[in-house]
């Protein structure tokens, strides 16, 4: 981003701290909490407000697994890495559950359903189930639709849950032990003599020993390192008025994850997806909904939930996700500023991986623990081996 001379108030106040975290979504807030818990002074800079980005614009579904069905993850990453990704998401779910209970915020643990739209997807779900069983992952498959909506196969995953992501993050921001500056978009990051870092934002300048960028899709706007590594990708969602009847309680994920839905405690239906029908149009930072995708979502809703035919759609919104090149989060530090760290590129699964990834980054920043397969340098290695 750029900031004019007239808009720049960063020189009006300067703060010094041990660590500055950029981004007050679920990753940045939890990272700040972890680092502050180790006795370090922490400042969080947020461009808008807590959970303003993808964290507060998703479906609030805490799911295990990656963007792929499990057998596809095994084929793509190899069995060992696919299983490590699964374990990371399982650990992440445990973290979110514990914090939700600590905060007293919403935690609806009714499990999740992977739903097949047709026989081809049913075959893939069977393969996914077999691969999950091979790795002792708890799940169940059935070829009878428990929702009675015409889905042809269902993999049930116990323990997955739904949250209210904004209230969750607001509660964390109040208890994280760090100083938060909202409406403080960062427009410059520069090294200081002696090894520190200076971050200039709209409201304040922060000088610190280390910084961490937890801005996901917006990382390329902060540093060119991310331009070829993180792709801003828009997702769209709608929410109906309450139906008056609870039809199902699980978090639902179908059409290979391209549609996802849940029924909220007030019986309204939240539905997102349809992006794959308009891939090229759904890239970039523009916050808007489109008639094509919203129409597709409404058609899906009426096909599978005709009870919603007379319900008014109360909310339509979009959110910008940060897609990594390989679908795995990117963690590391900037080549030109090694004390500026980052955790970005969650590929639509920030609630599934974000907190556990922040935990890995905190251990790396404070104790030098190896990032292993989360290390963003893997992309350079992949590029060097590409013919």
What is the role of each PLM region?
Residues 246-337:
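Active-site lid/adjacent beta-loop-alpha segment flanking the redox-cofactor pocket in flavoenzymes
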Residues 2-4, 68-74, 94-174:
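Flavin (FAD/FMN) cofactor-binding and adjacent substrate-gating region
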Residues 155-209:
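Helical element adjacent to the flavin cofactor pocket in flavoenzyme catalytic cores
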Residues 189-269:
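Flavin-dependent oxidoreductases
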Residues 37-57:
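Glycine-rich FAD pyrophosphate-binding loop
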């Amino acid at each position: 981003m750029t900031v004019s001379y007239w808009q720049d108030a960063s020189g009006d106040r300067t703060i010094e701290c041990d660590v500055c975290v950029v981004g007050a979504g679920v990753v940045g807030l939890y990272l700040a909490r972890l680092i502050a818990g180790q006795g370090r002074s922490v400042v969080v800079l947020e461009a808008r407000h807590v959970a303003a980005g993808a964290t507060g614009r998703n479906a609030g579904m805490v799911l295990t697994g990656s963007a792929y069905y499990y057998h596809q993850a095994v084929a793509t990453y190899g069995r060992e890495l696919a299983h490590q990704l699964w374990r990371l998401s399982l650990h992440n779910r445990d973290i979110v559950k514990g914090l939700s209970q600590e905060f007293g915020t919403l935690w609806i643990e009714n499990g999740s359903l992977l739903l097949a739209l047709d026989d081809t997807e049913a075959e893939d779900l069977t393969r996914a189930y077999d691969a999950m069983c091979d790795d002792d992952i708890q799940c169940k498959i059935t070829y009878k639709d428990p929702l009675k909506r015409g889905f042809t196969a269902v993999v049930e995953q116990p323990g997955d849950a739904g949250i209210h992501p904004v209230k969750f993050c607001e509660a964390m921001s109040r208890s994280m032990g760090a100083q938060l500056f909202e409406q403080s978009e960062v427009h410059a990051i520069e090294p200081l003599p002696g090894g520190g870092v200076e971050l200039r934002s709209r409201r304040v300048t922060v000088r610190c020993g280390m910084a961490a960028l937890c801005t996901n899709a917006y990382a390329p706007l902060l540093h060119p390192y991310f331009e070829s590594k993180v792709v801003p990708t828009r997702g769209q969602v709608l929410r109906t008025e309450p139906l008056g009847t609870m039809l199902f309680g699980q978090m639902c994920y179908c059409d290979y994850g391209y549609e996802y839905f849940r029924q909220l405690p007030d019986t309204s239906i939240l539905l997102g997806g349809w992006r794959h029908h308009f891939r090229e149009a759904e890239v970039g930072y523009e916050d808007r909904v489109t008639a094509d995708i919203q129409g597709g979502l409404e058609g899906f809703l009426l096909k599978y939930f005709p009870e919603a035919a007379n319900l008014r759609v109360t909310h339509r919104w979009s959110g910008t996700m940060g897609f990594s090149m390989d679908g795995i989060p990117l963690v590391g530090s900037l080549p030109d500023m090694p004390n500026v760290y980052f955790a970005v590129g969650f590929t639509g699964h920030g609630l599934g991986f974000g907190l556990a990834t922040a935990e890995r980054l905190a251990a790396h920043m404070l104790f030098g623990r190896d990032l292993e397969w989360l290390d963003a340098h893997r992309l350079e290695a992949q590029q060097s081996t590409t013919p």
